[in-house]
Amino acid sequence: MTRVALVKTRERITGVNRALDLLDLPSFGGKTLFLKPNYNSADPPPGSTHNDVLVALVRRLRELGVGPITVGDRSGMGDTRQVMQRKGIFHLAEELDFETIVFDELEAEGWQRMHVPGSHWRKGFAVAQPVLDAGAVVQTCCLKTHRLGGHFTLSLKNSVGLVAKQVPGDGYDYMSELHTSPHQRSMIAEVNVAYQP
């Protein structure tokens, strides 16, 4: 059974900690952790993950016994490195001792092609290998609708940032396929079978 915690507060750090208390997560036992924020753009929340949320998660997950933490993303609306720079993520990485990955900068071997039976993706889709290699994955979704598709998808759409726009050496544009498909909502959901949160 999946547990869900809802916390209403104006204090993000308090809210993150309270939600994690309610979830009563077991110790991570030193597992590596991939933390997927929403840095589709550097827009203020709810357009992107608030830095207080990221800081609270990193600190609290360390208390719960996670090993090395990596934070990474692929922006859909701009240059990912510039988005993360504008958000101050590289500074936070130094301050809080976590690694960062800009998915746009991964070489071809940094992507794993996924073929989901019955999927609407014509050629499958490519997921960032560091996500698949992590012992645990945590996402920080933004509660917003989406310009392309216009539906409220929570963390399902956030997983699209784990998928390559293009894999180096392969000219196929996965995001063009997704954003022009009449099956866009199904394709977004299908991306989420690639990993276990």
Name each region found by the language model.
Residues M1-P197:
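N-terminal and secondary-structure boundary signal
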